[in-house]
């Protein structure tokens, strides 16, 4: 089996003090880049897709391509549902072969968030599917969901303890000052809050909104208990920027086999840097 649950890889990261990168992908080329690079560096790997990505590319297509790439590189990986909100949607994608999910009920009141997450955990654990959930809200935009900065909420440490105990989740995404998208100013992460959460919660902790974070912040967050680091926007910008630049310089270009090469190369450099920041090269 080359498509696996994220549970074991995150537990290993927690025990050994590194983080597993979760790279948001969209199509064949972006999947090729992350699997190839992770395999070359022997890094554990999670490939993530939002509901919009799965609608665009097709869940069956993503799972099939990921499985074939994982097999050809002899590199097990997790295909992960990022920021999914509906149990019925998750059930359909689990049936299609996904083994790692994030249920996002962070926009609901605390009790309703618990109830939704618990229903997903009860279903997914029957099929050895790992479940991540979010407590607190990140600002910025993820897919079609936009959260204004004033509506972002940090994770409360004591609520985190109760949330994990009542839901039975495998990992917890927390809000400590990161945001989706690129930062207009350097973020100030609440490392004290992260420490307090880690003291109360024994499951692996997840950091969303890592695109553009300084290496020192990622390294410190990992040292304080972060076990999974999500990167999306930085990958898209590298890929699309190189593609636009190539087409600007080669107006006659019409062959995707040519103009995708620099786009993939630019994205690969970001993937390599994130793996280095996570300290997970050679950890597969």
UniProtKB/Swiss-Prot annotation:
**Record's keyword terms, sorted:** Galactitol metabolism, Lyase, Metal-binding, Zinc
| Gene3D superfamilies from the UniProt entry | Aldolase class I
Annotated membrane-spanning segments are none
* GO BP, one annotated term: galactitol catabolic process
rRNA-binding as UniProt keyword: no
**In the record's cofactor note, how is the cofactor described as bound?**
Binds 1 zinc ion per subunit.
Record: residues binding dihydroxyacetone phosphate:
181, 209-211, 230-233
Which cofactor does this sequence's record say it needs? Zn(2+)
What SUPFAM superfamilies does the record tag this protein with?
Aldolase
Catalytic residues per the record? 82 (proton donor)
Question: InterPro entries annotated for this entry?
Answer: Aldolase_TIM, Class_II_FBP_aldolase, FBA_II, TagBP_ald_KbaY/GatY, TagBP_aldolase_GatY
Which residues of the sequence carry a binding annotation for Zn(2+)?
Answer: 83, 180, 208
Entry's Gene Ontology molecular function annotations: tagatose-bisphosphate aldolase activity; zinc ion binding
Output the PROSITE patterns linked to this UniProt entry: ALDOLASE_CLASS_II_2 (PS00806)
The enzyme's E.C. designation: 4.1.2.40
Give the main EC class. lyase
**The protein's assembly and partners:** Forms a complex with GatZ.
Q: What is its biological role?
A: Catalytic subunit of the tagatose-1,6-bisphosphate aldolase GatYZ, which catalyzes the reversible aldol condensation of dihydroxyacetone phosphate (DHAP or glycerone-phosphate) with glyceraldehyde 3-phosphate (G3P) to produce tagatose 1,6-bisphosphate (TBP). Requires GatZ subunit for full activity and stability. Is involved in the catabolism of galactitol.
Q: Which family does it belong to?
A: Belongs to the class II fructose-bisphosphate aldolase family. TagBP aldolase GatY subfamily.
Q: What is this protein called?
A: D-tagatose-1,6-bisphosphate aldolase subunit GatY
